Amino acid sequence: MQEKAVVLDDQMIRRALTRISHEIVERNKGVDNCVLVGIKTRGIFIAQRLAERIGQIEGKEMEVGELDITLYRDDLTLQSKNKEPLVKGSDIPVDITKKKVILVDDVLYTGRTVRAAMDALMDLGRPSQIQLAVLVDRGHRELPIRADYVGKNIPTSSEERIEVDLQETDQQDRVSIYDK
């Protein structure tokens, strides 16, 4: 797998997350009834960063949850090859019923991860609204899902892969395109 290009560096990621934070505050007229829920793994770190920025903007701490969608994926049998899935568990510190839940993920591609996340959320409560924030939207949707907040649209071919590196897991912040 060969890297073709770095499409977002650390400064570009920082700016995109700051913009998304402002958009979340503006669209929801504040964040009083909102909860950020990151989809494991990188979505959690992006959600935490958004919460930090929103806290600076609004002067309020925002609740952040972690969502494990392992058992909700429709491609589980394709990935597992007769192995038991590794379930890490979800941790959402508040009742999401009647709250605006902002799902957060690193890359939006086919929409299947988001569909699985919505199924998992509905098992935990009944939010008044679900919104979606992603760092990168690369297109190629298989389901009718659209992000409400996008850091960067990066059109790709199906022969390319987007990789998001974050300081928390990869010791650097960047988004790259690779040939498969």
Swiss-Prot record:
It comes from Bacillus cereus (strain ATCC 14579 / DSM 31 / CCUG 7414 / JCM 2152 / NBRC 15305 / NCIMB 9373 / NCTC 2599 / NRRL B-3711). Gene3D superfamilies: 3.40.50.2020. Its EC number is 2.4.2.9. GO terms for molecular function: RNA binding; uracil phosphoribosyltransferase activity. It is an enzyme of class 2 (transferase). PANTHER family: BIFUNCTIONAL PROTEIN PYRR (PTHR11608:SF0). This is Bifunctional protein PyrR. Belongs to the purine/pyrimidine phosphoribosyltransferase family. PyrR subfamily. It comes from the Bacteria. Homodimer and homohexamer; in equilibrium. InterPro entries: PRibTrfase_dom, PRTase-like, PyrR, PyrR_bifunctional. The gene is pyrR. The keyword Kinase does not apply. Keywords: Glycosyltransferase, RNA-binding, Transcription, Transcription regulation, Transcription termination, Transferase. Regulates transcriptional attenuation of the pyrimidine nucleotide (pyr) operon by binding in a uridine-dependent manner to specific sites on pyr mRNA. This disrupts an antiterminator hairpin in the RNA and favors formation of a downstream transcription terminator, leading to a reduced expression of downstream genes. Also displays a weak uracil phosphoribosyltransferase activity which is not physiologically significant. It catalyses: UMP + diphosphate = 5-phospho-alpha-D-ribose 1-diphosphate + uracil. It holds the Pfam family Pribosyltran. Coiled coil: none annotated. A motif (PRPP-binding) lies at residues 101-113. One of its GO terms (biological process) is DNA-templated transcription termination.
